[in-house]
Amino acid sequence: VLCSSCLYLLAQALPNLNAAVGTWLGWVLLVVGCLAAAFYYTAGSRPYGYRGWGDGAVFLFFGLIGVLGTEYLHAGLLNQDSWMAAAGLGLWCSMVLNLNNMRDIESDLAAEKYTLAARLGLPCAKAYHSLMALFAWLLWWAWLPLGQGYLIIFSGVATMWHLYWLYSDHTLFTLDKLLPQWSLTVLAWVALLWLMCV
C-alpha cells in the first residue's frame, strides 16, 4: 500500500509518468509476487519447492519472467519469438535444479522433501532431464537465426555431452560433477547470446 501510494504521488507530481502509473504498479506487483514466490519456495508451513513444484517455479521465474520481463522492460513490447528463448532458458535452468534434486533424492526422501526428482525416482528423473534438454535444444534451434549456426552447434554438443555423462555413470559423484558443469554451460550460453546481440 505504501509503495502504491508513493508511486501514485510521484505520478501526480510528474505528468509524464501519469500515463505509466499502471505499468509501474504492474512491475511493483510482479516484484512483490517474485519475492513471495522466492520466500515460500522453502519457507512457510507448506513450501512448494518440497512438494514437487520447484521445477515449474524455476521455469517460470528464470525462464519466462526473466527473459520476457527483461525484454518488455527494455523494448516496451514482447516479440513473438522471444517465448521460445524464454522457454529454452527456463528448461535449462530447470535442468540445474533437477540435477541438484537427483543428487539429493535419498536425503530429500529421508527429510520428507518430495521434490519432483524424489517423486519420480532416479531413472524417471533422468528421462525427464533428457526430455527437458532435448526440448530446450529444439527451442534454441527454432529461435536462432540461420546465420548463427555456431550457437546451434554449441548448444547441441553441450546437450549431447551432458546427457552422455548423465547416463555413463550411476553414482551420485557424477551428478555432483554435472551440477557445476551444466550451470557453467548455461552461463556460457547466456554470455554467447549477449555477445551476439552487442
Give, region by region, the residue ranges found by the protein language model.
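Structural signature of hydrophobic alpha-helical transmembrane segments
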Residues: V21-V32, A85-G88, Q148-S155
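Hydrophobic alpha-helical transmembrane segments in multi-pass integral membrane proteins
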Residues: I65-L77, L138, V186-V198
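Multi-pass membrane catalytic core of lipid/isoprenoid biosynthesis enzymes
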Residues: V1-G22, Y114-Q148
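Interhelical loop and helix-boundary elements at the membrane-water interface
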Residues: V1, A37-F62, I105-S130, L163-L195
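Transmembrane alpha-helical segments that form the membrane-embedded catalytic/substrate-channel core
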Residues: V32-S45, L64, L68-G69, A87-M102, ...
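Hydrophobic alpha-helical transmembrane segments of polytopic
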Residues: L2, W27-C34, A85, H129-M132, ...
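Functional transmembrane core segments of multi-pass inner-membrane proteins
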Residues: A57-I105, P123-K126
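Intramembrane alpha-helical segments
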Residues: V1-L77
